[in-house]
Structure formats: C-alpha cells, structure tokens
UniProtKB/Swiss-Prot annotation:
GO molecular function, one term: transmembrane transporter activity
Lineage: Eukaryota, Viridiplantae, Streptophyta, Embryophyta, Tracheophyta
Short name of one Pfam family: MFS_1
Name of the protein in question: SPX domain-containing membrane protein OsI_32082
Any one annotated GO CC term: membrane
Organism: Oryza sativa subsp. indica (Rice)
Cell compartments where the protein resides: Membrane
Record key words, sorted: Membrane, Transmembrane, Transmembrane helix
Length: 706
C-alpha cells in the first residue's frame, strides 16, 4: 500500500510544492511527542499548544495561497471579460473560438486549485487522526470546535470555498454567451439552471467540487435521504461504466419505484379506518395500534431476508413480495365478514412480510448507472412520500357500502380489496416487463462477504469515497492509509478483506461509531414521534373533535403532501445557509416543541392546538429525517454502503422498530388508561426519547462536522 507521505509528494503540482501541508514534518512531531510523553518530559497542555500552533501555521499557508490563486483567476477572468466586450459589436469567429478556449483554460486552472485543496484537506484530517491515536487525546474534537466555529475561521475558508461558486458562475455565463451568440437573447439568469447549456469544463469543475464537498442541492439532498450509495461521477473506468449501462433497464427501475409507492400506500391506507375496523370486530378503538403495527413487526424480519435475497436476484424477491401482499390484503378485507380479529392481524403481518424496500434500494444502488443514480434515488424518496400522502387520501374517497357475492364492500374493507387489485395488476406487469440483471459470481461473492472475492473494482470505489467529504474527523476508511504509513508490504488480499461489506449483524455493529449510533437513535426518535401522531390520529380526533373518516383522511393526506415541499426548501435553500448539524439540532428542538404543544394540559383541547402541534411535529420530523440521513451517509463506514447489512437496512430497521414500539405503546396505553388519557400517555415516551436524542446529538456535535 502506498505510504501517504509519498503519495502526497507524488501528487503535488509542480511549482506549488512549498505551499502544501507539511505532513512529513508534522508526523515527525507526533512521533517526538509520543516519545516525550512516555518519558514524562513533555506536559499535555504544552503538547496541545505547540501542535495547535503548527497546524494553524500550515493551514494559514494553504488558505493564503488559495486566496492568492483565486485572485489570479479572477484577474484573468476580468481580462477575458474586456476581450469579450470588444467582440460584442464585431464578432469574429476565430477570436470567439480563441476566447472560449481561454475561458476553458481558466476552468482547468480552477480544477487544479480544487485538487490542491482536496489533497491538503486529506493531509490535515490524517494528521489529526494520527495525533489522537498516538497520544490518546481527543485533540480533533477540540481543534475542530475551536477553529471551525470561529468568525475568522480559516477551516471554513477551505471547506466552504465560497469564491469557487462565483468563478464557476462567471465561467458558465461567459461560455454560454460565447456558445449561444445566435438566436437567443437570454442570459443564464433568465433561464432555469437545468436548461443552461453546460460546457464540458463546467461539468469537470462541478464533479471536482462535488468530490471535495457534497453539494446540497435538492436532488442530492433527496438522494442522501434514500441512503443509497452514490458513485463519484468521475470514478471508474470506461468498462465499469459500460457494465452499469448493461445492467440498467428503465422499466425494471420503474417497477421498483412502483413497488415502493404501492407499499407506502398499503401502509397508510388503513390508518383512517383502523380504529373503526377494530371496534367492528369487538376490540377497543385503541387496538388500531396493533392493526397498524403488526405490519411493521413483520417488516423488521422481512427487511433482512429481502436484503440478503437481493444478493442473488431482484425479480424473485419482487415476485414474492407481490404475491404475499396480494394475499395479505385479501385476508385483511375478508376479516370483516369472518368476524375475526386474528385474520385481520395475520393479513397485516403478511403485508409486512412483503416489504421489498431493501430490494428497491439495492436495485438503484447496484443496477442504475452513476450518471442517473442520484435522480433515481430522489425518485425513490418522492415515490415514498407520494404513497404516504395517497394512502389516507384514497381511504377518504372509499365511502360506500354494498354486498357483492356475499362479501361486504364498505369503507372498512375497501382498502384491502383496492390494494389486492393493485398488487394483482403490479404482479402481471412485473411478470411481463421486469428484466433480471446479470449480477455475476464475483458480485455475489463480494456482496455476501465471501473470502474468495478479490475484485479490485470495489477497492477503487472505496478509494474514491475517501477524501474531503469525510472532512477532518476520523473514520473507518482511514485505517487503510494509516496502516500504509507503517506497513508498506500489505497484500491485495488483506486490502480486499478490509473493504468487504459486513457479513453479519455482529460485524455491522462493530462498524458503528458513536456518531452513527446517535444518528440511528435520532432516526428511531423521529419515526416514533411520527408513528404516534399518525397511528392514533383517528382515535384522538374522533374522541376530542368528532372528526369522521373523510376529515381524518384529508388531514393525513395534507401532512403527507408536505414532505416534498419541505425537503425542497431544506435541500435547496436552508442547507446552503447553515451546516447540516446546525439544522439537525434546530429541527430536533422544533420537534420537541411540537410534542410539548400536543399535550392536553387544560380542560378544553381545541382542534387548532392539535393541528398546529401536529404540523409542527410532522414537518420538524421530516426535516430531521432528511438532514439526519444526509449526515449518516457521510459518517458511516464505507463497508456499510453495500452488502446485506448495509446502512440503508440499519436505518430501516431502526425506523421499523420505532414504529413497532409506538404502535405497541398506543395499544397498551389504550387498554390501561382509556381513550381519555391516551394522548398524554403516548406523548410522554415520545417527549423523553426526543430529549434523549437531543442530548446525544449535542454530545457528538463535533463529530458531525460539515
């Protein structure tokens, strides 16, 4: 494995050597400090002070050089602008071509500067990690906290690279103007960003900047929300890109998205009528928690076997999912005429056993080419959100009551019959149109954790995932390069083993850092709060306000429809103004306020109080979910980005367990406290979990560095 010091020297840009981070010198200082502290000749505070000063000097050198180079690029753009102005009246084709090439040359210089920043950022992160490991200090937390949050922060100058955006804008505008001299009187500010003609150099700059730090536009925000592994757009060889194109089949992708949509509709279509169904079978209205939650109980187990099954096939698990969901919905609908609560619950359990969301995620991650994977990830999240909104809305429309061949068709049973018909149509469509991708034996072995696989393709992907997106804090991926500093003869076989996906729950758990554990706790908290709100909505609103099924359905549909606009606002605007960790804490506080506002503390409980608190709780939970999964996709080990026990499965399991616990809480509280005390009895655990998650977030705040 290549020694990082040698790699740093090898990758340096000729003429810029003196401005690079002096990793070799600082590594030597760390070794000196280690020996001195062992001998007792150096005090801890003195070591921290000396090393902080050395780091500050090195980072200042990098920042000042970066600003100097940005100034030179800006001066060149100004000169080119004057040349372009002279061509306005007398456009000469040859001079326009030369000017366009000069603009592209500036763009290439900007790419070079971005690579300079990336290499230095990696060096800073690695020396911080090495310092903590050798001396046993938590110096990284102190350094990041004290430097990144300071108003004169030089770290932020590197991480935010605000001037880069201005240069890209100037290049885009001028290249677009030179390219479109005829037939158009619009400039880039009059057009939608997606409609602007892009020069290849702009795409190269964007790809390099995205590798340096994750961009926070709406599309990427939704993609991270799905927690689907994203490949670097510049990563991989042409052969690898060709393999991705060979696997890709548009109709198969649409079928996976349709499966996601239908499953979310299936989950929430019963919420407005679950209490009425329970009472019609002789149970308490609060048994709606058991009716709704039984599907989540089964999903806890189905997510694991579907994730494992997708190692070998995509068609067969989707086929099995469709059949099981078809049968489950038929049982759900027939339970009314059979007068059996057991049949009702078994039907919902069968529906939960058909949850193929792990397969849908995996298909997008493995079989969709990198060029459109982010769009597919965003479509996955959008399909889930629309399904969540359409479920209750559809239930509100099914207001009828008649018999057909001895079967009762009413607002309680129709959700089951409608979904059974939907899954039957989907099953036929799947059988006719789905195309099974060729996984190949090497991919199967690798994803299943087989020791026989020595594929280097995934090693290269792991290397590309290393870098500035991890920022300064240590991660599992750093072990490779750090070991390279000490052992130069590490073999390819051991390297592949290090990069192999987790092969069991136990091995996946060992990869969970404190930051990842807190992120999963936050995910549990927000899903718990949302499930409490949604699952008991029909009981609470019926008891306090006398709402009918139609009103509850509209209320839940409006909440569901808020998902995409909220994500759009956060992903497009708010995340560009604040750090993700700041948004996370603020939205958790807002969620806590929503839960507190929901309590019935006075004699009169108004619909206005309930609606306002519900909207605040739900919207805050959506913001928390998006930002939390965005952060989770950065801080989790690369080994959790693929395989059976991947990050998507872990987050799904955390959310599903939260739903099970929440539905169980509703049922238990209804039996023990009755409908009159149900609201406060279920909100109290949600309040405690929310407080615990905020405390955990603050305790790991510095590990969530953006």
């Amino acid at each position: 494995m290549v020694n990082f010091s040698n790699k740093l020297t090898k990758d340096q840009i000729p003429g810029w050597e003196e401005y690079y981070f002096n990793y070799k010198m600082l590594k030597g200082r760390v070794n000196e400090y280690t020996e001195q502290t062992k001998e007792g000749t150096q005090y801890r505070r003195r070591v921290l002070k000396d090393f902080s000063k050395l780091l500050d000097d090195e980072i200042e050198k990098i920042v000042l050089f970066m600003i100097e180079q940005q100034g030179l690029i800006a001066a060149r753009l100004e000169d080119l602008g004057k040349r372009r102005a002279r061509l306005q009246d007398i456009p000469l084709l040859q001079e326009i071509t030369e000017l366009r090439e000069d603009y592209r040359s500036v763009g290439l210089d900007l790419v070079t500067l971005l690579k300079f920043v990336e290499l230095n950022a990696n060096a800073v992160r690695k020396i911080l990690k090495k310092f903590d490991e050798r001396l046993g200090y938590k110096f990284t937390d102190y350094y990041v906290r004290s430097r990144s949050n300071h108003p004169y922060s030089q770290l932020q100058q590197v991480f935010r690279h605000v001037g880069i955006g201005a240069v890209v804008g100037a290049l885009s505008r001028n290249l677009s103007d030179l390219e479109e001299r005829q037939g158009s009187y619009l400039n880039i500010y009059d057009q939608h960003p997606l409609a602007i003609p892009k020069d290849p150099i702009i795409d190269l700059i964007t790809a390099t900047a995205d590798k340096l730090t994750n961009s926070t536009n709406f599309l990427r925000f939704l993609g991270q929300h799905a927690l689907i592994a994203q490949a670097d757009s510049t990563a991989g060889t042409e052969d690898e890109q060709h393999v991705g194109e060979d696997k890709y089949h548009l109709m198969s992708l649409v079928l996976n998205l349709a499966n996601t949509f239908l499953y979310m509709v299936n989950t929430y279509i019963v919420v407005p009528t679950a209490d009425g169904y329970a009472t019609s079978l002789g149970a308490a209205a609060t048994a709606c928690g058991a009716v709704i939650g039984s599907m989540a109980v089964a999903q806890v187990f189905s997510s694991v076997y579907f994730s494992a099954w997708s190692n070998r096939s995509y068609f067969r698990p989707l086929l099995f999912s469709s059949v099981v969901l078809l049968l489950g919905n038929v049982m759900y609908a027939m339970a009314f005429d059979l007068g059996s609560l057991t049949i009702l619950l078994l039907g919902r359990v069968l529906c939960g056993m058909g949850s193929a969301r792990a397969v849908n995620r995996r298909y997008i991650s493995d079989c969709v080419p990198p060029r459109i994977r982010m769009q597919a990830s965003a479509a996955f999240v959008s399909a889930s959100a629309l399904g969540m909104a359409c479920g209750p809305a559809l239930a509100g429309l099914l207001q009828t009551n008649f018999s057909l061949y001895g079967l009762t068709i009413n607002q309680i049973t129709l959700p089951g019959w409608i979904m059974a018909f939907g899954w039957l149509v989907y099953l036929i469509w799947l059988w006719i149109s789905f195309q099974e991708p060729d996984l190949g034996p090497d991919a199967k072995d690798f994803y299943e954790g087989s020791s026989s696989s020595t594929s280097t393709r995934y090693m290269e992907q792991e290397k590309m995932e290393q870098g500035f997106t991890e920022h300064l804090l240590p991660s599992e991926q750093d072990e490779e390069d750090d070991n390279g500093d000490e052992e130069h003869n590490e073999t390819l076989s051991s390297s592949t083993t290090t990069l192999r996906p987790a092969s069991s729950v136990a091995s996946a758990y060992t990869l969970l850092t404190p930051s990842v554990k807190v992120q999963l706790l936050i995910y549990f908290m927000l899903k718990y709060a949302m499930e409490i709100l949604l699952a008991e909505s029909s009981v609470v609103t019926g008891y306090y306000f006398g709402w009918d099924i139609g009103t509850v359905s509209v209320f839940l549909a409006v909440l569901g429809l808020s998902v995409l606009p909220v994500n759009a606002i956060v992903g497009t605007y708010i995340s560009n103004m604040f750090e993700d960790r700041q948004i996370l804490v603020a939205s958790e506080m807002a969620l806590l306020a929503g839960v507190m506002l929901s309590f019935k503390l006075t004699v009169e409980y108004t619909a206005a109080q309930y609606v306002c608190s519900a909207v605040l709780t739900f919207v805050s939970a959506e913001v928390v979910e998006g930002v939390n999964l965005s952060l989770l996709s950065r801080v989790m080990s690369a080994r959790l980005s693929r395989g059976t026990y991947n990050g998507g499965l872990l987050s799904t399991e955390a959310g599903t367990v939260a739903r099970v616990v929440a539905d169980g809480t509703i049922t238990a509280a209804g039996l023990l406290a009755g409908e009159g005390r149900l609201l406060n009895a279920t909100l109290l655990p949600a309040l405690l979990v929310c407080v615990a998650s905020i405390a955990a977030t603050l305790s790991t705040y510095n590990s969530l560095f953006y």
